[in-house]
Amino acid sequence: MLPKINTIVYACDLDSKTQAAMELVLSLAKTHGAKVILMHAIEPLNAQASNMINNYITEEVRNAMRKDAITDINTRMDKLLAEFMEKYSEELSSLETAPETLIVNGAPADSIQRIAKEKNADLIVMNSRTHGRLSQMIIGSTANKVIHTSSIPVLVVPIK
């Protein structure tokens, strides 16, 4: 028997070039009657940056900045999802449940795999690369790590 896709985790970097991947995710969800989890991972600062910030910014200000960043990411994810839902409302009216949005703290590759396991995902979808200069030349390091370490199938969508 062929495997059933019940849950799809789409690891979204909130770039403006995510349309192709989002279209594919929503198409797969519609075809398979799958639940969609749209997630974004907030990468922690490295030790040097963290020490510098801790030396110059109070904990109260740091917490406020983090809260603002999470609010901004939530807003961007909701906007991205709303735009797709509006654009494809007719085609997506058959989705059993509205996509869930999730923001997690941690290294992206590890967070993607953790969420996929926690949510019993059958498929992870992600873009081929991030928006950094060096990563534009090759497959993104996050996608590369997930591809090589995930026990869940990974679909990588090229950014055009």
What spans do the regions from the language model cover?
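Short, flexible loop segments at boundaries between secondary-structure elements
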Residues: 154-160
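Structural beta-alpha unit
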Residues: 1-3, 82-124
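Local beta-strand N-terminus motif with an aromatic residue
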Residues: 5, 120-122, 134, 152
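General small-molecule cofactor/ligand-binding pocket signal
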Residues: 39, 100-104, 155
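A short acidic, glycine-rich active-site loop
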Residues: 58-77
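Glycine-rich, Arg-bearing micro-motifs that act as flexible, cationic patches
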Residues: 123-145
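Small/aliphatic-rich secondary-structure junction motif
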Residues: 2-63, 91, 118
